[in-house]
């Protein structure tokens, strides 16, 4: 994966591309703007703009958000809904559920590990929650 800055290619790792996708999903959770506007509003945060992987994954997640949220709901404690999950954790879970369910090119264990790392970086002590939900999801499949 690569982006361009001043005519030069910038190589991104899959982790960096995934982090861009997380940041787009998180940003999108605050507004009802079209995805294109969210991408445009956030592209300056990243050297070379937002990579194609992040844009593609976020677009697919937005298209399947209701289905993904319904899947997440199955693994919440009784009485909980996705609206109770913090915005950062929900963005992380949506990304990981999408990768696990729809992207055969990404091993489940990698999706879980990356999600836990994002949770450690962007949430206050919710990495165990994210890990538990994803573990239950993987065991159910």
Whereabouts are the PLM-identified features?
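N-terminal interaction/assembly modules
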Residues: 1-141
């Amino acid at each position: 994966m690569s982006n361009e800055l001043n005519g030069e290619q910038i190589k991104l790792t899959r982790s960096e591309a995934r982090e861009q996708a997380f940041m787009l999903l998180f940003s999108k959770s605050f507004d009802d703007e079209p995805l294109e506007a969210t991408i445009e509003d956030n592209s300056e945060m990243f050297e070379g703009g937002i990579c194609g992987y992040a844009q593609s994954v976020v677009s697919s997640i937005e298209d399947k958000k209701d289905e993904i949220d319904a899947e997440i709901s199955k693994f919440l404690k009784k009485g909980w809904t996705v609206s109770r999950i913090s915005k950062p954790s929900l963005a992380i879970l949506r990304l990981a559920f999408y990768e696990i369910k729809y992207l055969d090119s990404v091993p489940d264990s990698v999706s879980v590990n990356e999600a836990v790392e994002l949770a450690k970086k962007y949430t206050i002590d919710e990495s165990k929650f994210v890990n538990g939900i994803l573990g239950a999801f993987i065991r159910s499949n």
